[in-house]
A protein has these predicted regions:
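Catalytic-core regions of glycoside hydrolase
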Residues: 1-136, 141, 181-186
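Long, charge-rich alpha-helical interaction segments
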Residues: 107-108, 113, 121-126, 137-179
Length: 187
């Protein structure tokens, strides 16, 4: 039996405890994904960390429904590749037994979703897998000599988000603060 711990039902129960055959699927829909769930200073992320800690103490079967794209506009860059490994390790440390990473399924080429899918597969198989190794394997294998430019593009966006401490939830559109005229010209 599975139940969603989602939005208004996300907080751990105060008095009830799920039976051993009940899966609690905790959803991160309100979170900022530009930073690791655990390392972000936003209130939604702090609340999510508190909630996963609470559920981890009481649920034998804690699963995650995590988000990896902008659902408002699939072609809008969603620079979260540097958080994927940290988040998966965070889930593992908190007794999570199943992870569903919802990405861009309706537009298979939006925002380098194949790269993100490859990296998530590597981290789900081995949470200690190196982020740069996973990224470079895919970029070099798929793009060959052009991979250098793809990696520069990925780093350009991720560096801008990190430098300016930009927060991103899953409903961002093309008017995001990290897509400045300067960044778009460089991209």
């Amino acid at each position: 039996i599975e139940t969603l711990a989602y939005q208004w039902t996300r907080k751990p129960c105060k008095t009830l405890r799920p039976r051993k055959n009940v899966i609690i699927r905790l959803c991160s829909i309100e979170c900022c994904f530009a930073h690791s769930l655990e390392g972000c200073d936003s209130k939604p992320n702090k609340d999510f960390v508190r909630d996963i800690q609470g559920w981890a103490k009481m649920a034998d079967r804690l699963w995650i429904w995590n988000y990896c794209t902008s659902f408002a506009h699939y072609y809008t860059p969603f620079p979260t590749l540097r958080t994927l490994d940290d988040n998966i390790r965070f889930f593992v440390r908190h007794n999570v037994k199943g992870i569903f990473e919802q990405d861009n399924y309706q537009s298979p080429n939006g925002d380098l979703s194949s790269l993100g899918g490859y990296m998530m597969a590597k981290f789900l198989w081995d949470p200690s897998y190196d982020e740069n190794r996973a990224m470079n394997e895919f970029i070099e294998g798929v793009y060959g000599p052009a991979g250098t430019f793809i990696r520069q593009y990925v780093d350009l966006l991720h560096d801008k988000v990190a430098k300016d401490n930009i927060h991103m939830q899953i409903w961002i559109g093309p008017n995001v603060p990290f897509l400045t005229d300067e960044i778009v010209a460089k991209a």
